[in-house]
Curated annotation (Swiss-Prot):
Enzyme Commission code(s) on record: 3.1.11.6
Subunit structure: Heterooligomer composed of large and small subunits.
One BP term from GO: DNA catabolic process
Protein name: Exodeoxyribonuclease 7 large subunit
């Protein structure tokens, strides 16, 4: 049996291993090549991983060393690193303390990303016209992990902004070798079911390896074939995937994605409907008010109140025309007499007598024709005038009253046209053709039919 004093504590063992790491000359300065992974720029010290096809090691680069790096680190970038291996006692993990770092070409994943991006761009898939999102969506599909924070953020935002929206979750694997096929399967399922106004596809943040399913060509082409607009929410705001380029809209966060598919909140929609209703009611009231004013003006117009004045001007025009016609005839007769006198002064004897007789006959004929023409023209004008007067007479309110009709006014002379204009115990006046009759309202009854 081993004595208890011979057992080491975890701390003691870790400290022993750290001393071994620090004392080993082969670990004091190592030269490595690998791809950067799990990198996110921070203020101060930088933490990331170096990996190849079979292994991965954590790396730390202190502020002073990192300040000498003249380029930006990127996910998947292949680099050459000089540093020392050390053990971190609190976690018992060994890691590389990077002292110098420089690029070594392009990382495999990043290179694959750039190649696919270039290929799809050449096909014009990034330049497609964005499909518009509806202002008032009814159904939206969400493709993401059922256990992540993405779906919770989306549900919370939709419940706050537009609670009548129906969200349908299509759970998918969003990380690992099976993720791309799972995403494509769910997208095809949404397309088959149909009836969705938009699709949100996304996941939370992670390394380029974690997000890689959203850079797969099969996923990109499945998104292109979707009949409805697609909103991408993959990773953090600084992450960019092929899915972001293909989607109609890109959202930096799941909350932003939910806001994009609900452009108008339910409260705003209800307020807009209320405002439109008020405007419609006001417009109807204004139209009815203007129509009532026009009717009142028409009822008070000269045509209805003094119809005789309508054809006064026509009587005057006929009289003026008759006077001008008579004056014209007299002028022509005087001119003919003058010509006759002039001709007589130039003739003598028998020739004068013969010429005079002929002229008298001509004058008599002209007088007769003028008289006939004047009578015919006057007759035609009188007939036209009589026809116009008859037409106006039929339109005269007095004529209508003469056929047994009547109209009713109140004490102020306002015409009462509808049952709603009458009040019980109201004094009214009934106007007939030759006068008016006073009356008193005792009952009101609406006719049906």
């Amino acid at each position: 049996m081993v004595d208890a004093s011979q057992y080491l504590s975890v701390t003691a063992l870790t400290q022993y291993l750290k001393r071994k790491f620090d004392a080993d000359p082969y670990l004091a300065k190592v030269y490595l090549t690998g791809e950067i992974s799990n990198y996110r720029k921070r203020v101060g010290n930088q933490y990331f991983s170096l990996k190849d096809d079979h292994a991965k090691i954590g790396a730390l680069m202190f502020r002073n060393a990192f300040s000498k790096v003249q380029f930006d680190l990127e996910e998947g970038m292949k680099v050459l690193v000089v540093g020392r291996v050390s053990l971190y006692e609190p976690s018992g993990e060994y890691r590389l303390i990077v002292e110098h770092l420089e690029p070594d070409g392009v990382g495999a994943l990043y290179q694959a990303f750039e190649q696919l991006k270039k290929k799809l761009a050449a096909e014009g898939l990034f330049d497609r016209n964005q499909r518009p999102l509806p202002l008032f969506p009814k159904r939206v599909a969400v493709v993401t992990s059922p256990s992540g924070a993405v779906i919770q953020d989306i549900m919370t935002t939709v419940a706050r902004r537009y609670p009548i929206l129906q969200l349908t979750l299509f759970p998918a694997v969003v990380q690992g070798d099976q993720a791309a096929d799972s995403l494509v399967k769910r997208l095809n399922q949404i397309k088959t079911i149909g009836g969705f106004d938009a699709v949100i596809i996304g996941r939370g943040g992670g390394s380029i390896e974690d997000l890689w399913p959203f850079n797969e060509e099969k996923v990109a082409r499945a998104l292109v074939d979707m009949p409805m607009p697609v909103v991408s929410s993959v990773g953090h705001e600084t992450d960019t995937t092929i899915t972001d380029f293909i989607a109609d809209r890109r959202a930096a966060t799941p909350t932003a994605a939910a806001e994009i598919v609900t452009p108008v909140t339910l409260i705003d929609a209800l307020n807009r409907i209320s405002e439109d209703r008020v405007r419609l009611v006001n417009a109807m009231h204004n139209r009815l008010k203007n129509a009532a004013i026009r009717v009142q003006r028409s009822a008070q117009s000269v045509v209805l109140t003094q119809p005789d004045r309508l054809y006064d001007q026509y009587v005057q025009r006929v009289d003026q025309f008759q006077q001008r016609l008579q004056q014209s005839m007299h002028n022509r007769l005087r001119e003919a007499d003058h010509r006759l006198a002039m001709a007589a002064s130039q003739l003598d004897g028998r020739q004068l007598f013969i010429r005079l007789v002929n002229l008298q006959r001509q004058v008599t004929g002209d007088r007769h024709r003028l008289d006939q023409a004047m009578r015919g023209l006057v007759k035609t004008k009188r007939q036209a005038f009589a026809s116009a007067v008859s037409g106006l007479d039929h339109l005269s309110p007095l004529k209508i009253l003469g056929r047994g009709f009547a109209y009713v006014t109140d004490e102020q002379g306002q015409m009462l046209k509808s049952l709603s204009d009458y009040e019980l115990d109201q004094d009214i006046h009934i106007h007939v053709a030759d006068g008016q009759v006073g009356a008193h309202v005792t009952t009101k009854e609406k006719t049906h039919g």
